[in-house]
A protein has these predicted regions:
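Bacterial Sec-dependent N-terminal signal peptides
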Residues: 1-26, 460
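Residue position within the beta-strands of beta-propeller blades
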Residues: 60, 134, 196, 243, ...
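A short, acidic, flexible beta-alpha connecting loop/helix-capping segment that sits on the rim
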Residues: 423-425, 436-442, 532
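C-terminal outer-membrane/trafficking sorting elements
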Residues: 13, 462-540
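Trp- and S/T/G-rich repeat-edge/linker motifs of beta-rich repeat architectures
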Residues: 25-46, 53, 65-134, 140-184, ...
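Long, charged low-complexity terminal regions
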Residues: 369-371
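Short hydrophobic/aromatic-rich beta-strand segments that constitute the beta-sheet cores
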Residues: 60-61, 97, 162, 196, ...
Length: 540
């Protein structure tokens, strides 16, 4: 049936966008360290470092720093206590060990999904290859050699292949700490690389090789380095690759012989950088609120007096950045934990996590942290607030604090630091998963945790009816969604799930558009065009 949209047709009235809040929200624990999976493999760990959605599964990287299951901290079983990647197949399943990294890999330093689009020669692949990558370093105390290795998951059989990035001499630790990886295409040569920050050794790169079980052929010489402070983030913004090290933000100059320049420096703040804190943390590309280009969001944590200050860097038009103060977490903590004083705040362990709130249509960024506090009578663990806190940033740059699983009790297990967060990958589940801990050099056996916050889809209240200027059909739909309008031309549209994550986007060029939704899991979604929105149902 062909539908014509004319002035005589009554514009579709639908349930739209005056949504106040998701009132039915509940917390539950998804992972508790110290148990076993269905194959009787031990799942312990002191902290969950990353949570990643990959092909409708949820993966968690788990480390054993300061965990007494590890032989370096008093353990006796050499077959447990090393870094793991665990997997959750559905919300009601139990976590499974997916990768055991092996002896001397104390923790996975990074877990990230990357998408390869080109071969080693710069030619486009027939179809992109989406790969889950983990990486870490392993010190050998017999040979005094440190080996940095990446692991790539084979999704066909669930195994992991390895690729060596680099080897070097002692000491280990921050010299080989691989905290981030990023895909980038050199704008001059057209070659695609995966870049890795390898501690003070510098910036390394590799190319896609499907014949390699580890998927990547790494170049064992640093493209740039050594560095005085380990980099904690690497990002693409405004068509260029950037990374942070200490107080400095570097930009790559592309070409056959690439180089790096400093685009911004926080040295004027006068803080001495403690390498453990790192300086610039959580480097994240965001939309520039003052322009049409990209800006950066970051947390400034230079040393033991860090207050968790968040800055935004906006391009200044001359190759550098203007620095804009956004907030100081220590002040927000003092308001949230009444009567307390936060003498030290460390956060942005990975990135500022972005999602779109489907209720307000607002873009939110989450960032976790830990706080050393005094006063107010709040429960503490080795000086740190015992509960897990995270901050939420709205699109106006305003911040608020929330606590994982509600206010923690004096007898509850310590959560301390929220290190990571990700939207649920599971069809029919509207939830955000959170993970973390951070031993802070204290004994921390089986302290790793994952909580999830559920949003009940049927709990959206204050829904009012408005007339929209567009028609969508069919609704419900299983494969394609058609959009028709007389008035909207060359408008951007977005499809958002009920966690606020953008899952499809595109443009209406003219009066009609066809949107492929076949890959979306069955659920309720919101289609947003300009300042209007409409709800639809995706079916099998």
């Amino acid at each position: 049936m062909k539908i014509y949209l004319t002035k005589r047709i009554v514009v579709l009235t639908w349930l739209i966008c005056s949504y106040s809040m998701l009132n039915a929200q509940s917390w539950s624990k998804s992972f508790t360290a110290g148990g076993y999976d269905s194959d009787n493999k031990f799942l312990g760990g002191s902290e969950v470092l990353q949570l990643v959605n990959h092909k409708s599964m949820l993966f968690a990287s788990v480390g054993y720093w300061e965990d007494e299951n590890n032989i370096w901290y008093g353990g006796f079983n050499t077959n447990i206590g090393w870094g793991q990647i665990n997997r959750l197949d559905n919300p009601s399943a139990i976590w499974q060990e997916d990768l055991f990294m092996g002896a001397n890999h104390l923790r996975p330093e990074i877990l990230k999904q990357v998408i390869f689009t080109k071969d080693q020669f710069g030619n486009l692949l027939t179809s992109p290859d989406t790969v889950l990558i983990a990486a870490g370093y392993s010190p050998n105390y017999i040979t005094n050699i440190v080996t940095v290795t990446s692991f790539a998951r084979n999704d066909l059989n669930g195994t992991w292949g390895e690729s060596e990035i680099v080897q070097g001499g002692f000491p280990a630790g921050e010299n080989y700490s691989i905290r981030d990886i990023e895909m980038y295409v050199d704008q001059q040569t057209g070659l695609e690389y995966v870049f890795a920050t390898v501690g003070t050794q510098g910036i390394y790169k590799g190319k896609y090789n499907p014949a390699n079980p580890g998927k990547i052929d790494w170049i064992s010489t640093a493209e740039f380095g050594p560095l005085s402070i380990r980099p904690l983030g690497i990002e693409v913004a405004n068509g260029a690759l950037h990374f942070s090290s200490g107080s400095k933000l570097y930009r790559r100059i592309d070409g056959v012989s690439p180089s790096y320049v400093i685009d911004h420096d926080f040295s004027d703040l006068g803080a001495k950088i403690n390498s453990a804190a790192g300086g610039i943390r959580g480097l994240t590309t965001i939309n520039n609120p003052s322009g049409v280009d990209d800006a950066f969001l970051l947390m400034w944590c230079p040393n033991g007096q860090s207050q968790g200050t968040i800055y935004r860097l906006e391009p200044d038009g001359a190759g550098g950045f203007n620095r804009i103060y956004e907030t100081k977490l220590s002040l927000l903590i003092a308001s949230f934990l009444v009567g307390s004083n936060a003498s030290y705040v460390l956060g942005a362990y990975n990135e500022f996590y972005e999602y779109i709130n489907p209720i307000s249509n607002d873009t939110i960024h989450l960032v976790g942290f830990e706080a050393n506090i005094s006063g107010g009578g709040h429960p503490i663990w080795n000086g740190y607030y015992k509960g897990g806190l995270f901050a939420k940033r709205d699109s106006n740059g305003q911040y608020s604090i929330e606590e994982i699983n509600g206010t923690i009790g004096a007898n509850d297990t310590a959560l301390v630091a929220n290190r990571c967060y990700v939207a649920s990958p599971f069809p029919g589940e509207s939830a955000v998963y959170f993970g973390g801990f951070d031993p802070n050099s204290n004994a921390s056996t089986n302290m790793a945790w994952v909580y999830k916050k559920d949003y009940q889809v049927n709990a959206i209240d204050d829904i009012t009816k408005h007339e929209t200027n567009f028609v969508i059909y069919p609704n419900p739909s299983s494969n394609q969604l058609f959009i028709e309008s007389e008035n909207l031309e060359d408008y951007e549209f977005n499809i958002i799930n009920l966690l606020g994550k953008e899952v499809v986007s595109g443009r209406i060029n003219g009066q009609t558009a066809t949107v492929d939704i076949s890959s979306l899991p069955p659920n309720v979604y919101i289609l947003r065009i300009a300042n209007e929105a409409v709800k639809f149902v995706k079916t099998n």
